[in-house]
Amino acid sequence: MEAERPQEEDGEQSLPQDDQGWPPVNATARPWRSAPPSPPPPGTRHTALGPRSGSLLSLQTELLLDLVAEAQSRRLEEQRATFHTPEAPPNLAPAPPRLLEDKEQLYSTILSHQCQRIEAQRSDPPLPPGGQELLELLLRVQGGGRMEEQRSRPPTHTC
C-alpha cells in the first residue's frame, strides 16, 4: 500500500516536482522530509478546505521550514570569519644551544635560592607542655658532658 502524496488543488500555481511527486529539496535544506499525514478515519468530517487541506498545510509547513533553515544557513555563512595562521618569518632560525644552557642555569639558580630560603624559614618544633623542664632534668642526671659526647651532627640538606 503506497502512502498518499500531497496533491495540489486546481487553480494554484504548480511547483516543480521530482519523479515521486515531491517538491525538490535544495542542498542546504534538511536532508529529510516529513511524511504526509495519514488519511482521516472514515466517518470524519472534512474541513471547509477539503480532504487534502492537511497535506497542503504539511507541505507548506515543510517549505516554510526549508526557507527558514536556508536563511539561517546563509546568515551563519555571512558571519563566519576566516582564520589566517601567521607564517614564521624566514629570518628566525631555531634557538641556539646557548639559550638552552642559559635556561638550565636559571632553573638551577632559582632552585638553589628557594632551597636556601626554605631552610632559613625552618623552626624547631614546639615542645609539649613541661618538655623543657624534662630536658633540663635529663641534662642534670646524665651530666652535660656525656650528652654532648653522644650528640651527632644533623644531616645537611642539599636541594
UniProtKB/Swiss-Prot annotation:
<dbReference type="Pfam" id="PF02188">
    <property type="entry name" value="GoLoco"/>
</dbReference>
<keyword id="KW-0597">Phosphoprotein</keyword>
<feature type="modified residue" description="Phosphoserine">
    <location>
        <position position="55"/>
    </location>
</feature>
<dbReference type="GO" id="GO:0002690">
    <property type="term" value="P:positive regulation of leukocyte chemotaxis"/>
</dbReference>
<feature type="modified residue" description="Phosphoserine">
    <location>
        <position position="34"/>
    </location>
</feature>
<dbReference type="GO" id="GO:0050729">
    <property type="term" value="P:positive regulation of inflammatory response"/>
</dbReference>
<keyword id="KW-0963">Cytoplasm</keyword>
<dbReference type="GO" id="GO:1900017">
    <property type="term" value="P:positive regulation of cytokine production involved in inflammatory response"/>
</dbReference>
<feature type="modified residue" description="Phosphoserine">
    <location>
        <position position="38"/>
    </location>
</feature>
<comment type="function">
    <text>Interacts with subunit of G(i) alpha proteins and regulates the activation of G(i) alpha proteins.</text>
</comment>
<feature type="compositionally biased region" description="Pro residues">
    <location>
        <begin position="87"/>
        <end position="97"/>
    </location>
</feature>
<feature type="modified residue" description="Phosphoserine">
    <location>
        <position position="58"/>
    </location>
</feature>
<feature type="domain" description="GoLoco 2">
    <location>
        <begin position="103"/>
        <end position="125"/>
    </location>
</feature>
<protein>
    <recommendedName>
        <fullName>G-protein-signaling modulator 3</fullName>
    </recommendedName>
</protein>
<feature type="compositionally biased region" description="Pro residues">
    <location>
        <begin position="34"/>
        <end position="43"/>
    </location>
</feature>
<feature type="domain" description="GoLoco 1">
    <location>
        <begin position="61"/>
        <end position="83"/>
    </location>
</feature>
<feature type="region of interest" description="Disordered">
    <location>
        <begin position="77"/>
        <end position="97"/>
    </location>
</feature>
<dbReference type="InterPro" id="IPR003109">
    <property type="entry name" value="GoLoco_motif"/>
</dbReference>
<feature type="modified residue" description="Phosphothreonine">
    <location>
        <position position="61"/>
    </location>
</feature>
<dbReference type="GO" id="GO:0005737">
    <property type="term" value="C:cytoplasm"/>
</dbReference>
<feature type="domain" description="GoLoco 3">
    <location>
        <begin position="131"/>
        <end position="154"/>
    </location>
</feature>
<feature type="region of interest" description="Disordered">
    <location>
        <begin position="1"/>
        <end position="54"/>
    </location>
</feature>
<dbReference type="GO" id="GO:0005886">
    <property type="term" value="C:plasma membrane"/>
</dbReference>
<dbReference type="InterPro" id="IPR042888">
    <property type="entry name" value="GPSM3"/>
</dbReference>
<keyword id="KW-0677">Repeat</keyword>
<dbReference type="GO" id="GO:0030695">
    <property type="term" value="F:GTPase regulator activity"/>
</dbReference>
<dbReference type="InterPro" id="IPR011990">
    <property type="entry name" value="TPR-like_helical_dom_sf"/>
</dbReference>
